[in-house]
Regions:
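ABC ATPase NBD coupling module
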Residues: 63-76, 214
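Conserved ABC ATPase "signature" region
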Residues: 100-115, 166-167
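A short, proline-enriched helix->beta-strand linker immediately N-terminal to the Walker B motif
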Residues: 138-142
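Catalytic Walker B motif of ABC-type/P-loop ATPase nucleotide-binding domains
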Residues: 144-148
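Conserved ABC ATPase signature
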Residues: 119-123, 127
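Glycine/charge-rich catalytic "coupling/switch" loops of P-loop NTPases
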Residues: 237-240, 262-307, 325-356
Length: 356
């Protein structure tokens, strides 16, 4: 468990202030914020690379605020993997450790068995980061810190590295704090999110809560995410109608699924079953006054709940079981003669729904 109490550090041009933050044992907490918000400086304080002006850092009840980095039982993973160039993969992971049982578990979880004898110079960016993660785990840290760890990895490798992290967390249940500016990564791996802006922790909560109910206009603008819903994924593989309803082509690793909430069911492509999130960008939603003959699997009748003028665009809130937000122009609003209470149909493809 990680507890931060009344932490302060002067950073030009603001003061980093974290009055209190608790991260439970086994929890993954993701700290989101724009560039320059103080995220990396916060991690440096936790890791012991710099000292706070005030406050305490508690790891499993012990005050580590004034301890050097090597005595804190905290590991940190940076954007760039810093590996020993003269050692192979196995030697890098096991450097300074002699726990053969943990070593075997780590390389299996990370899928690195086939690379143990390889030199690190031949590794891809994603493989290098997995090696760095393995080495971080070999010291049996109480806390794992991650500083934008997927940022420098090519998009093709990123998903595999993120999946490896999730696999490690499921098996080892390590307490983790990751900082990033990428909200999709935050959604994918976090139990809770925090928003850091100009050194202030301005909001914390479950991912859906933070994205659906931002605490301020500034937070809402930063997140830029509309139509985020929590629910449950169920594979359609055994459904008699799945052959008809499966969108094609499907991204590798994804399958046709139903995303079920208390008030609606969506057709989506998912990469896992069980709890998760669905995100539908407003631009992916088509509006129609009448039902449409379309290949899109998701078509919902709804009612206009609210009309909000936002500069040159109009935001419609439409209740279709779930409340969707859609943006249209003033001209479209007039042409469709929409008002509060108007009936409207929402249409979007299963492949346009991002799933986490």
């Amino acid at each position: 468990m990680l507890v931060i109490e009344e932490l302060k550090k002067a950073l030009a041009p603001f003061v980093l202030e974290i009055p209190r933050l608790e991260i439970q044992k086994g929890e993954t907490f993701v700290l989101l914020g724009p560039t320059g918000a103080g995220k990396s400086s916060f991690l440096e304080l936790l890791a012991g690379f710099s000292q706070p002006d005030e406050g305490r850092i508690l790891v499993d009840g012990s005050d580590v605020t004034e301890l050097p980095p090597d005595q804190r039982r905290i590991s940190i993973l940076f954007q760039e993997a810093h590996l020993f160039p003269h050692l192979n993969v196995g030697e890098n992971i096991g450097y300074g450790a002699n726990d053969t049982t943990l070593f075997a578990q780590v390389i299996e979880l990370l899928g690195l068995e086939h690379l143990l004898s390889h030199g690190v110079s031949v590794l891809s960016g994603g493989e290098r980061q997995l090696v760095a993660l393995g080495r971080a785990l070999m010291v049996r840290p109480h806390i794992l810190l991650l500083d934008e760890p997927f940022n420098s990895i090519d998009p093709q490798s990123r998903k595999g590295v993120i999946e490896a992290f999730r696999r490690v967390h499921r098996e080892i249940q390590i307490t983790s704090l990751m900082v990033t500016h990428n909200f999709e990564e935050g959604l994918y791996i976090s139990h809770r999110l925090g928003i850091l802006m100009k050194g202030k922790l301005v909001q914390t909560g479950a991912p859906q809560e933070v994205f659906s109910k931002p605490a301020s206009v500034q937070i809402a603008r930063f997140l830029g995410a509309e139509n985020l819903f929590a629910g449950h994924f169920e594979s359609m593989a055994d459904s008699e109608s799945s052959a008809v309803q499966s969108p094609s082509p499907q991204p590798e690793g994804y399958f046709p699924a139903l995303f079920k909430t208390d008030s609606a069911t969506l057709h989506v492509l998912a990469d896992h079953e069980g709890p998760g999130y669905a995100l539908i960008q407003p631009k992916e939603i088509t509006l129609s006054l009448e039902p449409m003959h379309s290949s899109a699997l998701n078509q919902f009748p709804g009612t206009v709940k609210d009309i909000i003028h936002k500069g040159s665009l109009i935001q419609l809130e439409i209740n279709a079981g779930l409340v969707f937000k859609v943006f249209i122009t003033s001209q479209s609003l007039q042409e469709m003669q929409l008002a509060k209470g108007s009936k409207i149909h929402l249409i979007f493809k299963a492949s346009s729904v991002k799933t986490y």
